[in-house]
From Swiss-Prot:
Alphabetically ordered keywords of this record: Ribonucleoprotein, Ribosomal protein, RNA-binding, rRNA-binding
Function: One of the primary rRNA binding proteins, it binds directly to 16S rRNA where it nucleates assembly of the body of the 30S subunit. With S5 and S12 plays an important role in translational accuracy.
SMART domains per UniProt: Ribosomal_S4, S4
Complex and partners: Part of the 30S ribosomal subunit. Contacts protein S5. The interaction surface between S4 and S5 is involved in control of translational fidelity.
Organism: Opitutus terrae (strain DSM 11246 / JCM 15787 / PB90-1)
InterPro entries with a match to the protein in the record: Ribosomal_uS4, Ribosomal_uS4_bac-type, Ribosomal_uS4_N, S4_RNA-bd, S4_RNA-bd_sf
Domain of life from the UniProt record: Bacteria
Span of domain S4 RNA-binding: 92-164
Gene: rpsD
NCBIfam families: PRK05327.1, rpsD_bact
Annotated GO CC locations: small ribosomal subunit
Stated name of the protein: Small ribosomal subunit protein uS4
Family the entry assigns: Belongs to the universal ribosomal protein uS4 family.
Gene Ontology BP annotations: ribosomal small subunit biogenesis; translation
């Protein structure tokens, strides 16, 4: 299945909450696409509920099913609560971190920013969006006019966005630090990760 590139508001309406940074259009029409107004929805099966939750999280991070499932399998093999570790692995992807730091308006834009070589981690170029940062990592925008002009514009546009406590950002030096790994309340809200764990346990 290809990565979704269509209208973001349609995705938000499908899941009943803002996904992929959509805004006012979703607020006007928060009911599912295809309906001409809000109406009661039929009771859905446990399988459908789990599938919906999985798809919602996959859209938020913009991953293909194969990539998404691979991250889940890694989380399942590690110590700790599988669902929480799964979210942690998604949230600490380099593209997600770049987005959270305000260096891109969306995770999709952050993925391009990383892929185009604008980011350094611990002094080394990292152009792999799926790279997982760890506590103590130093992240920096490449010291070039093109990279820093782009970063400056994004930081200005996203200045009202709060950087989560597990990260720190110095906009003047274009440097950030991973203070620690995120806790559950610092990660994606509106997601019931246990439903995703139960969904994948069926296979």
């Amino acid at each position: 299945m290809a990565r979704y590139t269509g209208p973001t508001t349609r995705v938000s309406r499908r899941f009943g909450q803002q996904i992929l940074g959509s805004g006012k259009a979703f607020e006007r029409r928060s009911y599912p696409p295809g309906q001409h107004g809000p109406k009661l929805r039929r009771k859905v099966s446990e399988y459908a509920v789990g599938l919906n939750e999985k798809q919602k999280l996959r859209y938020i991070y913009g991953l293909l099913e194969r990539q998404f499932r691979r991250v889940f399998e890694i989380a399942k093999k590690e110590r700790g609560v599988t669902g929480e570790r799964f979210l942690q692995l998604l949230e600490t992807r380099l593209d997600s971190v770049v987005y959270l730091l305000g260096l891109a308006k969306s995770r999709a834009a952050a993925r391009q920013f990383v892929n185009h070589g604008h980011i350094r981690v611990n002094g080394h170029k990292v152009d792999i969006a799926s790279y997982n940062v760890k506590a103590g990592d130093e992240i920096e925008v490449k010291n070039s006019p093109a990279s820093r002009q782009l970063a400056t514009r994004c930081l200005e546009e996203n200045r009202i966005r709060n950087v989560p406590g597990w990260l720190s950002m110095n906009a003047e030096t274009f440097k950030a630090t991973v203070n620690r790994l995120p806790t559950r309340d610092e990660m994606e809200q509106g997601i019931n990760e246990q439903l995703i764990v139960e969904f994948y346990s069926r296979f």
